[in-house]
Amino acid sequence: MTENSTSTPAAKPKRAKAAKKSTDHPKYSDMIVAAIQAEKNRAGSSRQSIQKYIKSHYKVGENADSQIKLSIKRLVTTGVLKQTKGVGASGSFRLAKGDEPKRSVAFKKTKKEVKKVATPKKAAKPKKAASKAPSKKPKATPVKKAKKKPAATPKKAKKPKIVKVKPVKASKPKKAKPVKPKAKSSAKRASKKK
C-alpha cells in the first residue's frame, strides 16, 4: 500500500519539469525567423548560423539540432522561408517577405497585374475549343460501334465452315493418287523385262 502511494506522486513532478523546459524558449519556428532577421544576409543564412544564434540566445535542449531541421523544412513548405541554396534542411534560407526591399515588391506587383490581365484572354480560348470538342466526340463514337458489331459476327460464322471442308477434300485424292502409279509402273517394268 505504501509503495503504490509513493510511486504515483513521483510521476507528476516529471511532467511539471518537462513543461517548465518548454517555457524557457519560444517555438523553434519563431527562433529561426528571429535568427534570420538578426543576420540580415541578402543571400540567406545557413542552418549552422541559425543553430548558433538559437543556442547562444535561448536555452535549448540537446535535441535542438534535429528540431531546428524539422522546423526549417516546415517553414519552407508553408512558404514562410525561401531556400536560396542547397536541398532540404541544408543550404541557406531567407524570409519570403521580410528581407525583400520595398522597390522589388512594387515591381513584382505591377508585373503580376499585367499577367492577370493577359491570362483571362488566353484561358477563354481553350475553354471554347474544349466545349466544342466533347460534343462532337460522343456523336461519332456510337455510330462506329454499331458498324463494327454486325461486321464481326458473319466473319466468325464463315471461317469454321471453310476449315471443316478443306481437310475432307484434300485427304481423298492423296490416298487415290499413290495407288494408281504403282500399278502402272509395275506393268511397265514387267513388259520391259520380257
Curated annotation (Swiss-Prot):
Record GO biological process: chromosome condensation; heterochromatin formation; negative regulation of DNA recombination; nucleosome assembly
Protein name, per record: Histone H1.0
Modified residues (N-acetylthreonine): T2
CDD domains assigned to the protein according to its UniProt record, in alphabetical order: H15
Post-translational modification: ADP-ribosylated on Ser-104 in response to DNA damage.
GO molecular function list: chromatin DNA binding; DNA binding; double-stranded DNA binding; minor groove of adenine-thymine-rich DNA binding; nucleosomal DNA binding; nucleosome binding; structural constituent of chromatin
Residues where Citrulline is found: R42
Keywords: Acetylation, ADP-ribosylation, Chromosome, Citrullination, DNA-binding, Nucleus
